[in-house]
Amino acid sequence: MPTSVKCPTCQKDVIWNNESKFKPFCCERCKLIDLGDWASEKHAIPVKPEFDADDLDNLGYDEADFFKEN
């Protein structure tokens, strides 16, 4: 029995096999809608910021000093 998944955009059933041209999407339209959502930042992968602005302030980093010449 072939594996079936839901299209992430329209929730239509999609057969998952080598002939599925747009998998996991059902069609090119749904694929492009999803791409547009990523491009407009409706979708995002959550990440923890490498540096917290408050931590940098506590360490003594000041934006005003950044552009001063020595």
Curated annotation (Swiss-Prot):
Binds 1 zinc ion. GO terms for molecular function: DNA topoisomerase type II (double strand cut, ATP-hydrolyzing) inhibitor activity; zinc ion binding. Pfam families: YacG. The keyword Transport does not apply. Keywords: Metal-binding, Zinc. It comes from the Bacteria. GO terms for biological process: regulation of DNA-templated transcription. Zn(2+) binds at residues 7, 10, 26, 30. Its cofactor is Zn(2+). Interacts with GyrB. Belongs to the DNA gyrase inhibitor YacG family. Inhibits all the catalytic activities of DNA gyrase by preventing its interaction with DNA. Acts by binding directly to the C-terminal domain of GyrB, which probably disrupts DNA binding by the gyrase. This is DNA gyrase inhibitor YacG. The gene is yacG.
